[in-house]
From Swiss-Prot:
UniProt similarity note: Belongs to the complex I subunit 2 family.
Chief place where the protein resides: mitochondrion
Function noted in UniProt: Core subunit of the mitochondrial membrane respiratory chain NADH dehydrogenase (Complex I) which catalyzes electron transfer from NADH through the respiratory chain, using ubiquinone as an electron acceptor. Essential for the catalytic activity and assembly of complex I.
TM segment ranges: 3-23, 25-45, 59-79, 96-116, 127-147, 148-168, 178-198, 201-221, 247-267, 276-296, 325-345
Gene Ontology CC entries for this record: mitochondrial inner membrane
UniProt-recorded name of the protein: NADH-ubiquinone oxidoreductase chain 2
Matching PANTHER family: NADH-UBIQUINONE OXIDOREDUCTASE CHAIN 2
Pfam short name (any one): Proton_antipo_M
Enzyme Commission no: 7.1.1.2
Length: 347
C-alpha cells in the first residue's frame, strides 16, 4: 500500500478512536465509530484476494449494524432526556440497546461470530490492529455507560464469552483464529469486572493489548499463520522460540507470568463483592484457554517436526525485524507481575 495512503488511514483510525474516547456527545461518539470503521476496511483488504474481501465485508456489515443500534440508543435517550450530551443513559431500553451495540463492536458472545472469520481472512498486521486498537473505542463506550448497564445481561455475555473463547480455540490449528478466540475470552474477563471496578477493566485492557501485540509481533517475525509453521521457529530463530514459549504461557494466564495478574485481580475483586460462584466458573473455564496455549507451546518449543538439513541452518541467515521493539515488549508482557501490589493500590 502507498505510504501516503497508509499514513492517512492510520491517522483517521487514531482520530476516530480519540473522538470516541474524549467525546461526551452521542452524535460525536457515533461519528468517531464511523470514522474508525471506514478507515480500517482498506487495511483489511490490502492483500487483494477473495478472503480479505469477504472478511472486510463481514466486518462492515457487523459494525454498520452495531452503529445503527448505537444511534438508535442515542435517539431514545434524546427522547427521554431532551439532550445529546452526557453519557449517562436515563432510559433502561436505551441502556440495553447501547450495551448490545458495543458488545457487537467488541465481539462479545453471542455477537462473536464475526471475530474469528474476519481475523482469519486478513494479514497478521491488520489482525493486530483489529484485536488491539479497535477494542479501545468500544471498551471506552462501555466504561462511560457502566453505571447504568444491566448487570444480569452483562454478566451473561461475559460468561458466554469466556466459555466460547475457550471452547472455540480447542480444535484450531490456525494461529489467527486462536488469537481471535483468545480475544473473545479476554473481553469476557474485562466486561465481567466492569460493574464492580471500571478502572480495573481499563488496566486489564492495557495488559491484554501488551500481550497480544507481543504475540502478533512474534508471529510476524516468523511469518507464521499455522501451528505447523510456528513449529519451524526452532530452525529459523532459536532465541525467538524461547521467548514465544514464555509469551504463550503468559497469554494463557499461568503464574508467575504477567497474564496471571488480570485473572487474579478480577477474581479477588469479585470475591470481595460477595460473588463466589461466577469467579469459580470463570477460573475453571480459563483452563480451556491454558490448554490450547500449552498445546501451542508444545508444538513451538518442545518438539521439532521432520525437516530437511537445509532448514536446520536457516537461523544463521535470519535478520529479524522488530527485534529492538520486541525485547521490551516481551519483558513487559511476561515479567511485570511483581508490580501487582502497586497496581492494586492504584485500584
Amino acid at each position: 500500500m502507498n505510504p501516503l495512503i497508509m499514513s492517512i488511514i492510520l491517522a483517521t483510525i487514531i482520530l476516530g478512536t480519540t473522538i470516541v474516547m474524549t467525546g461526551s456527545h452521542w452524535l460525536m461518539i457515533w461519528i468517531g465509530f464511523e470514522m474508525n470503521m471506514l478507515a480500517i476496511i482498506p487495511m483489511l483488504m490490502k492483500q487483494h484476494n477473495p478472503r480479505s474481501t469477504e472478511a472486510a465485508t463481514k466486518y462492515f456489515f457487523t459494525q454498520a449494524t452495531a452503529s445503527m443500534l448505537l444511534m438508535l440508543a442515542g435517539i431514545i435517550n434524546l427522547m427521554y432526556s431532551g439532550q445529546w450530551t452526557g453519557v449517562k443513559l436515563v432510559n433502561p431500553t436505551a441502556s440495553i440497546i447501547m450495551t448490545l451495540a458495543l458488545a457487537m463492536k467488541l465481539g462479545l458472545a453471542p455477537f462473536h461470530f464475526w471475530v474469528p472469520e474476519v481475523t482469519q481472512g486478513i494479514p497478521l498486521s491488520s489482525g493486530l490492529i483489529l484485536l488491539t486498537w479497535q477494542k479501545l473505542a468500544s471498551m471506552t463506550g462501555l466504561y462511560m455507560i457502566s453505571p447504568g448497564i444491566n448487570l444480569n445481561m452483562l454478566m451473561t455475555m461475559s460468561m458466554l464469552s469466556i466459555a466460547i473463547g475457550g471452547w472455540g480455540g480447542l480444535n484450531q490449528t490456525q494461529l489467527r483464529k486462536i488469537m481471535a478466540y483468545s480475544s473473545i475470552a479476554h473481553m469476557g474477563w474485562m466486561t465481567a469486572i466492569l460493574i464492580y471496578n471500571p478502572t480495573m477493566t481499563l488496566l486489564n485492557l492495557v495488559i491484554y493489548i501488551l500481550m497480544t501485540t507481543t504475540m502478533f509481533m512474534l508471529f510476524m517475525i516468523n511469518s507464521s499463520t499455522t501451528t505447523l509453521s510456528l513449529s519451524h521457529t526452532w530452525n529459523k530463530m532459536p532465541l525467538i522460540t524461547t521467548t514465544t514459549l514464555v509469551t504463550l504461557l503468559s497469554m494463557g494466564g499461568l503464574p508467575p507470568l504477567m497474564g496471571f495478574l488480570p485473572k487474579w485481580m478480577i477474581i479477588q475483586e469479585m470475591t470481595k463483592n460477595n460473588n463466589i460462584v461466577l469467579p469459580t466458573i470463570m477460573a475453571i473455564t480459563a483452563l480451556l484457554n491454558l490448554f490450547f496455549y500449552m498445546r501451542l507451546t508444545y508444538a513451538t518449543s518442545l518438539t521439532m517436526f521432520p525437516t530437511t538439513n537445509n532448514m536446520k541452518i536457516k537461523w544463521q541467515f535470519e535478520n529479524p525485524k522488530y527485534l529492538s521493539l520486541l525485547t521490551p515488549m516481551i519483558m513487559m508482557s511476561t515479567l511485570t507481575l511483581p508490580l501487582a501490589p502497586m497496581m492494586m493500590i492504584l485500584n
